[in-house]
Amino acid sequence: MNVGIIGAMEPEVKILREAMQNPQTLTKAGFTFYTGELAGNTVTLVQSGIGKVASTIATTLLIDNFAPDCVINTGSAGGFDPSLNVGDVVISSEVRHHDVDVTAFGYEIGQVPQMPAGFAAHPKLVAAAEQTIAQISDVKTLVGLICTGDIFMCDPIRIEKARSDFPTMLAVEMEGASIAQTCHTLNTPFVVIRSMSDIAGKESPQSFEEYLETASINSSKMVVALLEKLTAVSL
């Protein structure tokens, strides 16, 4: 399978990049794409940068230039479910924007006009990710809603509003929904797999930086194991 992998920050892509065999690089619009073999698949890896605009551009370039069969977004997130701890993993069943509000025109909270309210991850990718993580790790793994916004969620007022708007949200981050929206538009299956670097309402920039490496190691490990399983999956 031809798989595209996107991570926002250097620690989130470094481990995967170093594990690739016969890597080749291509730079487009300031983004460096690494193509090679990883766990029995052809893989193209890119560090998108942080936020929705950067990740949208990176995803568009990835799909347009490399035509992956699917896209995996990996990296860290802030946990919203109270049962989650640092290092635990959330797999997206659906991804939504938490910082979009066009409800004045009849749209759902988080819904971009002319787009679905949420973007569903491909069920085969979700199932494969869930099975993989259960086999290789004893960390808690939840499957459900991940929300995205251009906000580092450490303000209690913003956190409570997000909880009110999206009561089933398991985790929050800054790229997944824009990647998902781009994949939806360009008809490419996707899944988001995030390891918790902090827990919303408890985190600070210091705690995020402290646990980012742990989250990056965990998420990279999950992606490699998922790639091994994808050799037998047909989308």
Curated annotation (Swiss-Prot):
Signal peptide as annotated in the record: none
Pfam families from the UniProt entry: PNP_UDP_1
GO cellular component, one term: cytosol
One GO term (biological process): L-methionine salvage from S-adenosylmethionine
GO molecular function: adenosylhomocysteine nucleosidase activity; methylthioadenosine nucleosidase activity
Catalytically driven reaction(s): S-adenosyl-L-homocysteine + H2O = S-(5-deoxy-D-ribos-5-yl)-L-homocysteine + adenine; S-methyl-5'-thioadenosine + H2O = 5-(methylsulfanyl)-D-ribose + adenine; 5'-deoxyadenosine + H2O = 5-deoxy-D-ribose + adenine
Annotated residues for binding of substrate: G78, M153, M174, E175
Keywords, sorted A to Z: Amino-acid biosynthesis, Hydrolase, Methionine biosynthesis
Class of this enzyme: hydrolase
Active site residues of this protein: E12 (proton acceptor), D198 (proton donor)
Enzyme Commission identifier(s): 3.2.2.9
Pathway info: Amino-acid biosynthesis; L-methionine biosynthesis via salvage pathway; S-methyl-5-thio-alpha-D-ribose 1-phosphate from S-methyl-5'-thioadenosine (hydrolase route): step 1/2
Family according to the record: Belongs to the PNP/UDP phosphorylase family. MtnN subfamily.
Function, in words: Catalyzes the irreversible cleavage of the glycosidic bond in both 5'-methylthioadenosine (MTA) and S-adenosylhomocysteine (SAH/AdoHcy) to adenine and the corresponding thioribose, 5'-methylthioribose and S-ribosylhomocysteine, respectively. Also cleaves 5'-deoxyadenosine, a toxic by-product of radical S-adenosylmethionine (SAM) enzymes, into 5-deoxyribose and adenine.
Protein name: 5'-methylthioadenosine/S-adenosylhomocysteine nucleosidase
